[in-house]
Amino acid sequence: MRITGGELGGRRIPPPRTGFVRPTPDAVREALFNLLPDMRGGRFLDLCAGTGIVGLEALSRGAATAVFVERQAVNGRRLRELLADFGLQGRSRVIIAEVRKGVKILMEEGRKFEVVFADPPYERALIEGTVACCRRGDILVSGGLLVLQRSVREIIDPVVEDRGLILKAERRYGDTVLSFLEQAMED
């Protein structure tokens, strides 16, 4: 596994230390960052971060900051080590917590992000809960994007648009689908 672009492009990331991580493949990450707006100066949130490869990619491509929320402590500690090895600790933060608690912490701090990337474990009925958590947490800037990585066998509840998120696009890569939901603009 390697970072595909930006200042850290080509740097290798060690494999996960647990068997419960499914890193986003290189080709899917490249496609993701080709579809996202320019990350330079932006704030990026990586939920269900696992190895942290997607947030590392955002930092490599110019994001001002990235916050990683990862439930498994072994992965969170390893991610902190990687960020230090790459000299990124001043632009990043790792929260070792499940998504709901991590979002609550960020909400209480008043943090908002241009891009929130969420990659919950496939086919465990976590997509709707992740979307609802992000909406309740009010962590997206007006016009910000929530990108969900999910299995092709999972669907997004059509009521997400009633929650202030608009499904803008979906892209399929084998069994993986990236869904791009935009935070409705404030009046």
Language-model segments: which ranges?
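Class I S-adenosyl-L-methionine-dependent methyltransferase catalytic core
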Residues: M1-D187
